[in-house]
């Protein structure tokens, strides 16, 4: 929140409660619920945003194919939201898991941003399929 300056705003959305932070508007809700997205859009008003960060992950069931599908669905929702809300040069950071649907999602990212960078966090276990994709400079492709 310190990086956005006096005119910037930070919004945080989570299903779990979060302790208040200065200069952060927190919305408790599920990103998959239309009522939550409506509340977020109402808070944004007519403003476009510079950056969307999605660290969403579903509750893991242990059924790999189901867990992967849910992860990719959340990433797709976040990309759809980003394309609607980002300004013309906005950026999007999203956590995904490599597996079924990853290549298609990567293609959608490449259609939507001028450059896509992949990063595996050092904190992520070596055998984990977790990876972050950073879409730089939205260019308006339709995923």
Where are these regions (language model features)?
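Class I S-adenosyl-L-methionine
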Residues: 98-143
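A short glycine-rich, Lys/Arg-flanked "PGG" loop and its adjoining helix->strand segment in the class I
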Residues: 70-88
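S-adenosyl-L-methionine
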Residues: 6-7, 13-61
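Glycine/threonine-rich flexible loop motifs
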Residues: 60-71
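Short strand-turn motif at the edge of the Rossmann-like AdoMet-binding core
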Residues: 15-16, 56-57, 95-98, 121-122
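Helix-to-beta-strand junctions that scaffold the AdoMet/dcAdoMet cofactor pocket
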Residues: 4-6, 86-87
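Conserved beta-strand signature within the Rossmann-like core of class I S-adenosyl-L-methionine
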Residues: 84-96, 119
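Class I S-adenosylmethionine-dependent transferase superfamily signal
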Residues: 40, 81-82, 109
């Amino acid at each position: 929140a310190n990086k956005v300056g006096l005119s910037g705003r930070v919004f945080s959305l989570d299903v779990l409660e979060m302790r208040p932070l200065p200069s952060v508007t927190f919305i408790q809700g599920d990103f998959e619920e239309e009522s939550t997205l409506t509340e977020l859009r109402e808070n944004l008003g007519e403003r476009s945003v510079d950056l969307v960060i999605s660290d969403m992950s579903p509750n893991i069931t242990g059924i790999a194919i189901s867990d992967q599908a849910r992860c990719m669905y959340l990433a797709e929702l976040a990309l759809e939201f980003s394309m609607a809300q980002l300004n013309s040069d906005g950026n999007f950071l999203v956590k995904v898991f490599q597996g079924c649907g990853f290549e298609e999602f990567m293609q959608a990212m490449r259609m939507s941003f001028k450059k896509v960078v992949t990063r595996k966090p050092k904190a992520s276990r070596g055998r984990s399929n977790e990876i972050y994709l950073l879409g730089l400079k939205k260019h308006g492709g339709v995923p």
